[in-house]
Amino acid sequence: MAAARVLRTWSQNAVRLTCVRYFQTFNSARVLKPKCVCSVGYPLFKYSQPRHSLRTAAVLQGQVVQFKLSDIGEGIREVTIKEWYVKEGDTVSQFDSICEVQSDKASVTITSRYDGVIKRLYYNLDDIAYVGKPLIDIETEALKDSEEDVVETPAVSHDEHTHQEIKGQKTLATPAVRRLAMENNIKLSEVVGSGKDGRILKEDILSFLEKQTGAILPPSPKSEITPPPPQPKDRTFPTPIAKPPVFTGKDRTEPVTGFQKAMVKTMSAALKIPHFGYCDEIDLTQLVKLREELKPVALARGIKLSFMPFFLKAASLGLLQFPILNASVDENCQNITYKASHNIGIAMDTELGLIVPNVKNVQVRSVFEIAMELNRLQKLGSSGQLGTTDLTGGTFTLSNIGSIGGTYAKPVILPPEVAIGALGAIKALPRFDQKGDVYKAQIMNVSWSADHRVIDGATMSRFSNLWKSYLENPAFMLLDLK
């Protein structure tokens, strides 16, 4: 009888158990974790959807947070503040430029990760900032208190949940790469990164953009090309360099920063390399004529054509025959790594100092494509805007010291590379032809330096002879172009 009374009471007062959803907040995103919602009645157990809605208030985010300098990559631990784009009291949005910093390898624009008001700048111009340390204080915008209806939805399947987690993975990319993607309306989730741990590099963005839009302009019809009239060659005089101001007071001491600091590291390491030199003379008479014919064609396509694209392409063809010159050695010279890509560096003299950006994959580029890339690097280099990707990864280097003046040089190898060439000025000099007649020749001298631990003189000489043959007879390059 007692059991019957208990059963009757249970049937009259059905027990309803409700397990409520709860919320956890990670950063600024609210993640819903559902618990089961069920009702228990007699004599049948069944699952049902709740008919009510839960209400929650948005998290108030009006607080001052420290914006720390993120890891820029390439082992960079400190940078110099070159320019502030904001000041205290300014209002910024996500991806707005905060400042321009310069490391010993590249210049990088730092962008905001928050919407808010700048409360404090931790550094002045030319101060040294360290990775992981606060850069600015920013008061994030407060979200107005609001209540949101939470609509109950069926449980998400395991496959869907896994897919969402993959989508939510963090994309590895530097602020400069993210800004480049944003300026070109590219979603980083659609780009496959080729860097370490899937990091998206600037090359990946440019490659993705080229696939979407195409980067090479079609050649212009010959009928539209109007070569500029030849200009009279006046005698030029060197422009006198302005004398530095004379300091009559105390001596001045400045820290070594930026590209100068990079030169200290690189040249100190280069002292450990036993250099040997090799020089030769190149007759560029035929190449000078060919360039004069192609200059208006390239100009019609919007590209300034110099001699360097020909020098780089000839060097790449030579490296295919002598891959040891496109190799690198480890610190103790115990291992040699033969590089598949010909990333040929070009030494540039800029207001910021000596920089050596490199043209990637010269072995698969045409002379015109090399000229396009050189134009881009020169524009960025003159304004101090070269990125880390442009300044790293070189495998072989040419230095055009002749553009400033000089005939010979003793170039210093850039570790871990094993060879470098210095190009002198092109001069009109008398030479004898095969018949013994004197003619006006366009002569350039080249000075090579190589790592004598792994390169012998015969190898350097054979490479130089092959490179020379391509430049003295440009038509020969057509036989080996791929």
From Swiss-Prot:
The record's catalysed reaction(s) read: N(6)-[(R)-dihydrolipoyl]-L-lysyl-[protein] + 2-methylpropanoyl-CoA = N(6)-[(R)-S(8)-2-methylpropanoyldihydrolipoyl]-L-lysyl-[protein] + CoA
Q: Which InterPro entries match?
A: 2-oxoA_DH_lipoyl-BS, 2-oxoacid_DH_actylTfrase, 2-oxoacid_DH_E2_comp, Biotin_lipoyl, CAT-like_dom_sf, E3-bd_dom_sf, PSBD, Single_hybrid_motif
UniProtKB keywords: Acetylation, Acyltransferase, Lipoyl, Mitochondrion, Phosphoprotein, Transferase, Transit peptide
Q: Record keywords: Heme included?
A: no
* Entry-linked PROSITE patterns: BIOTINYL_LIPOYL (PS50968), LIPOYL (PS00189), PSBD (PS51826)
Catalytic center residues: 452, 456
Positions annotated to bind CoA:
291, 306, 349, 378, 399-400, 403, 424, 426
**Where in this chain does the record put each Peripheral subunit-binding (PSBD) domain?**
172-209
Q: Mind telling me which CDD domains this protein's record contains?
A: lipoyl_domain
Cofactor(s) it depends on: (R)-lipoate
Q: Which Pfam families match?
A: 2-oxoacid_dh, Biotin_lipoyl, E3_binding
Signal sequence interval, chain numbering = none
One GO CC term of this entry? cytosol
Q: EC number(s) of the enzyme? A: 2.3.1.168
Q: Which residues carry this modification: N6-lipoyllysine?
A: 105
Which domain of life does the protein's organism represent? Eukaryota
Q: Where does the Lipoyl-binding domain lie? A: 64-139
| Entry similarity comment | Belongs to the 2-oxoacid dehydrogenase family.
Q: What is the protein name given in its UniProt record? A: Lipoamide acyltransferase component of branched-chain alpha-keto acid dehydrogenase complex, mitochondrial
